[in-house]
Amino acid sequence: MKKILIVEWCCSGLGGDPALLPMSLVCEGKTMLLALMDSLNHAKDLSAKTVLHPNLTSTFPSELALSISPFPGWAELARSFDLLWPIAPETDGILLGLVQKSREAFQTVLIPNDDLIALATDKLQTFHHLKRHGLPTPETFPIESFQAGGGTFQVIGGTFQVIDGTSPPGPWVLKLRDGAGSQGMRLIVQPAELMGLEENRWILQTHIQGTAVSQAILGGPTGPWFCPPCIQQMSKDGSFAYQGGSTPISSDFARRTQRLTERLVKTLPPWLGWLGVDMILGDAVDVILEINPRLTTSFVGLNRAAGGSLAPAIIRHAFGENAVMPRFSAEPIGFDASGNTTEP
């Protein structure tokens, strides 16, 4: 029996007391962790445990959790488990740092390689990668110096300045360069809205009207598996807060999504485990927005569509075993950001 350790950064205490962390990150982390644990522990040949901050132990089944404070060393944990599945936000190098430390102890860490994590974490570098390979993606600029609409513009000392030309055409989407989920995102209509922002941390992307979709791609030694795409539900107040999603999507949307992700995969190194891709299917153009180098909330809906068997299949695929892609239900399944699923 394979013993699997799942470490979710917010819930484990690696980030300190979860009560002091952004609520959206803790909620998303807990949602993914519970769904993943449930899926893995339904497999007879797998056993999964997680590490929890003492303040969260009452919210998890006692048989699934190790309550350890302070967080033990990776070498100590590696002696009791065959595989580590880490989940963490990319922001401030948290995911990459966690993975690099854990690789020193664990022989198998179910996460993309460090170079791919670094590429996907930095949204500006992701943009340059996509452009270099001829993949459609919104124009993306660092706020401290960008060009658009024939002009050159800068944010200096928190003040927006037109260096040359006229004010660039909007609207844009403001994002943290290394943000996780919709952290810090908002719609920008006028350049003056950029005033007061900390330089070097933020980017602007041209706002593309259309339908937000995501697709999970599962890496393993025999090649990638493409999960059914999901519609993403975002708030309409300009903050783009993630509210959940649904699957399956229309056959036309599915073909368009698959066309983009297949092209993307050809530009990436091989990887293990989950890779999420966010896209916009527009009236005029379909674009890739971001790459997520770790588990995303859409796992909740996709695992339900797979009858609860998705996580064990990901493990077997990563180990190069005689794994079979799960069958996903054709019945509509909705899910929210808290992990609740709905079916007709």
Language-model features: locations:
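Active-site nucleotide/adenylate-binding loops and adjacent lid/helix of ATP-dependent enzymes
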Residues: L116-T211, G219-C227, G244-R263
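Conserved N-proximal alpha/beta basic substrate-recognition cap immediately N-terminal to
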Residues: S39, K49-Q147, D164
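A short glycine-rich, hydrophobically flanked beta-strand micro-motif that places a catalytic Asp/Glu
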Residues: W271-D283
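Peripheral (often C-terminal) accessory segments that flank ATP-dependent C-N-forming ligase machineries
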Residues: L83, G282, A313-P344
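Short catalytic helix/loop segments, enriched in acidic residues and glycine
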Residues: L20-S39
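Conserved protein kinase catalytic/activation segment
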Residues: V285-V287
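Extreme N-terminal starter segment of soluble prokaryotic enzymes
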Residues: M1-L5
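ATP-dependent carboxylate/phosphate-activation module, predominantly the ATP-grasp catalytic core
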Residues: Q205-P269, L281, N292-F319
